[in-house]
């Protein structure tokens, strides 16, 4: 268990064979003139591999990173190198071998990507990674190699805490500031290193935790404050502006529409029922114009009664016309009763031509109220 398996196909053999000496019982791979490790050479499914014992794996990885030795993957060469190295990664993560994890993410993966000319993503069951190990990986790996890991874990971790997210944001901030303040920022594919603020907000939405939500929003509002703008050129300033537009201003209207309203009777991974957070966001708006045209129709369509209570609290007595209109679109007794409690003119609706177009539950409720009030 834990062996590091490396392809010994023609290309790698060409580079490695000069460092390998065969002895009576095994092979030696010389890392320098007087330093070597013992290795095995095996054939698996018609392909030769070097097998390195786990205890020597870090030295071997350092060696191939230094020499930039790796397969040029193509249709002409098919080995299972990625499979074996993914197994090695699983082993070191599961057993928390920090030195091996560090060299794998900090040195090995960047070398592999530079040789292959594309980014090779190593797979792992995110929910099985210890949170402390995840933070360690994020700290030592390149952002483009670890951002997918963070995103996957946010969606699959069952109990993410504020403390955990605080540490992740701290690491992310440090890396972003370093990149944006550096001279090689134009070489960075920023689409691969940006993490949407929504990703960081997912745990708070899942728990409907206002404190958690506010913490994340506040952290991102000051995410890039440590950058000295006087030392940046025009291109860097333009890029910084792009990042700030993504992180420092949360478009509440769009956020409500995209992430908090849907048909909750169906499964939707990216939309969350969170009435407490919904209430805070709605009550922070200046007006209801956007919600009136986009969010309110969906709340009525999906019959989200608790959300409608928030909308009605926001409207108060300022827009009776809208309250009346919403009653005509209600789809349940509970929704209709709520709107009537907030002042919807059910008598006017009953006497209008719109009444016959109402949902059956609304008509039944209104007729019942009309009958009861007339009897009294």
UniProtKB/Swiss-Prot annotation:
Family: Belongs to the mimivirus L17x/L18x family.
Descriptive protein name: Uncharacterized protein L181
Record organism: Acanthamoeba polyphaga mimivirus
Native organism taxonomy: Viruses, Varidnaviria, Bamfordvirae, Nucleocytoviricota, Megaviricetes
């Amino acid at each position: 268990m834990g062996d590091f398996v490396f392809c010994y196909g023609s290309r790698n053999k060409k580079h490695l064979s000069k460092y390998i000496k065969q002895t009576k019982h095994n092979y030696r791979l010389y890392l320098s003139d007087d330093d070597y490790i013992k290795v095995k050479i095996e054939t698996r499914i018609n392909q030769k591999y070097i097998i390195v014992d786990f205890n020597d794996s870090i030295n071997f990885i350092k060696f191939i990173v230094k020499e930039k030795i790796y397969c040029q993957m193509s249709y002409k060469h098919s080995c299972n190198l990625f499979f074996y190295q993914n197994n090695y990664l699983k082993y070191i993560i599961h057993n928390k071998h920090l030195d091996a994890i560090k060299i794998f993410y900090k040195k090995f993966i960047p070398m592999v990507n530079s040789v292959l000319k594309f980014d090779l993503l190593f797979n792992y069951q995110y929910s099985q990674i210890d949170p402390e190990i995840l933070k360690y990986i994020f700290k030592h790996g390149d952002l483009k190699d670890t951002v997918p890991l963070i995103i996957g874990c946010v969606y699959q971790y069952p109990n993410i805490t504020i403390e955990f997210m605080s540490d992740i944001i701290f690491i992310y901030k440090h890396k972003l500031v370093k990149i944006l303040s550096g001279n090689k920022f134009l070489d960075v594919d920023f689409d691969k290193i940006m993490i949407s603020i929504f990703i960081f907000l997912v745990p708070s939405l899942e728990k409907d935790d206002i404190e958690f939500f506010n913490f994340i929003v506040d952290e991102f509002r000051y995410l890039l404050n440590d950058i000295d703008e006087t030392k940046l050129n025009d291109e860097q300033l333009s890029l910084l502006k792009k990042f700030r537009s993504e992180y420092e201003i949360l478009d509440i209207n769009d956020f409500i529409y995209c992430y908090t309203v849907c048909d909750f009777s169906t499964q939707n991974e990216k939309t969350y029922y969170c009435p407490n957070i919904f209430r805070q966001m709605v009550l922070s708006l200046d007006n209801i114009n956007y919600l009136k045209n986009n969010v309110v129709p969906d709340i009525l369509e999906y019959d989200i009664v608790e959300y409608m209570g928030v909308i009605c609290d926001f409207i108060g007595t300022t827009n009776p016309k809208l309250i009346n209109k919403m009653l005509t679109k209600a789809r349940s007794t509970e929704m209709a009763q709520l709107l009537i409690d907030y002042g919807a003119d059910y008598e006017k609706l009953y006497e209008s031509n719109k009444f016959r177009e109402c949902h059956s539950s609304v008509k039944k409720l209104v007729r019942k109220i009309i009958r009861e009030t007339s009897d009294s």
